[in-house]
């Protein structure tokens, strides 16, 4: 119903008479849904008739084709595909979200390219060469509505503003609420979001100075709340609700500190 083949054609994704673009993308998607972690693992599935049928082929393409496919894609194709996907979901009646989860994800790179920057890989708790991807997910529908797979380290702090501008162009209004980690952007950009009327929820960096201030807070300033409908072990945490000031941010910010 979304017209996936037409969408890929307008975006300019590569294909051939033997393996059109929608079949190539279908093969990659089939492997991902089946649980194959990497393209190099495809050789164990090339004789799986079910995966091939799902992708619309008589056999899943082999490792060499799938590995080089991304290198054949024009970088301008990704924004075109993203816009087409956004429009297609709108025609199908998918409601536009009001709250969005934002995050960076590092895709490890194991080659020798000197131009590839190092980024933090959370699963390995270290920095290594990789491509930094910025993804935005609708908190209500769980649909990914924005992505940029080529973020440079020097530009990553402003990526949140690029998403806000993209959403404004596509919908005519700014996103209502953004949820993200503390390392995603700067205090100055938080101030910019506030000026645009965009609400945000984020985690602060837990510095030594911040922790010392929390421990010096008298017990009378804390209050205990009860969380319902959750499976967490601690359902009655203590919270400290206060107003704070930050550098590069105009006006007060509401900060909620939680202790079990």
Predicted ranges, named:
Residues 1-127, 133-153, 157-170:
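Dynamic "connector" segments at or just before major functional cores
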Residues 178-187, 206-209:
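Acidic, metal-coordinating catalytic cores used for nucleic-acid/nucleotide bond scission
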